């Protein structure tokens, strides 16, 4: 596979689509970042939003297999940076629909600088400000050898500008070690102090720490009132997508990066626990 770099993952995706003249419909999860949808539409593709699978919170696999014959591309997102190998699903899609293009969006995962092979046509990682490893910008991609790649000038969309970004592997690995260590310190606090019943499984806790509570907005407001950042996930882009909508309604993303200290993480748990049986 070819190693690609750009200022943003959306730029890598856009270049890939335009240079290879890819058109048609894209299947993508309903909780996708809206910037990705903008990129796809700007490249001239249409989109179909698919609900999430309850057991892994990624795009619903049976729905993808049912709709794939009407699509030219599937964009698979590793929800909340879940570190799991979905290659068997990709191979199943490819076996039933050989012509479909597969983009493996791992932008919330820990970047890998040594991807030698994948059943996906394009694998994306990001090192932007809100991602797992924050280098202040930049993206890494791996492209199957059969595809072409080149820079495409974009005049109208600031999300896709051609800013120069150079990959520094040494800097990336140094950052990764420090980031992982800090995240684990904060995650240890969250795991120990918060009820296990409201925590998502560990596979979803690398990028941020996720909990599910019935009074999401009140908890977020209480945290922010003390200067502790917290977010809810993206809303579903299709109201019929129940699992994605439920995550938007009940999930809270607790920060575990350099923005937060261990003292703040402890205080966040105290605030959440103060809601008592409501959480």
Regions picked out by a protein language model, each given a short descriptive name:
Residues 46-55, 231:
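Short beta-strand->loop structural element characteristic of the AMP-binding/adenylate-forming
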Residues 170-173, 177-191, 198-212:
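Conserved glycine-rich beta-strand-loop-beta hairpin in the small C-terminal domain of fold type I
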